[in-house]
Amino acid sequence: VDSVLGSARAFVVHQNVKETIFKIQKDLWLLMADVASLGKEPNIGSDHVKDLEQTIDKYTEELEPLDHFLVPGETQGAAFLDVSRAVVRRAERSMWRLSETEEVHESGIRYLNRLSDLCFTLSRYETEVK
């Protein structure tokens, strides 16, 4: 997830999107630490999830309502964000599978769920905002 988001950051054209992705990458380091040390107090909590939701709302305010399906790949940055979304969804499913045998912090799973939505929103932003 971190690597593909780094690739997206290299290609997006909006500076605010670059900054948002970089912040997410730092959060992912915390999430990776949580997964590496299951059973300990999590670094990623509900405040991180709330922050993602607020970020999604902030970007969504600048977008037109969505009334059609989107075809991925309008720009290089958007394409990498589309791939990032798929990779994040895969990571979320892996966390759910892991939770069947290990004590996984629910906040980490919620974070990944919201992150995939943010990737979708950022891809739209890269495509639609000039």
Protein language model regions, located:
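Phosphate/pyrophosphate-binding loop motifs in nucleotide- or prenyl diphosphate-using proteins
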Residues: 2-130
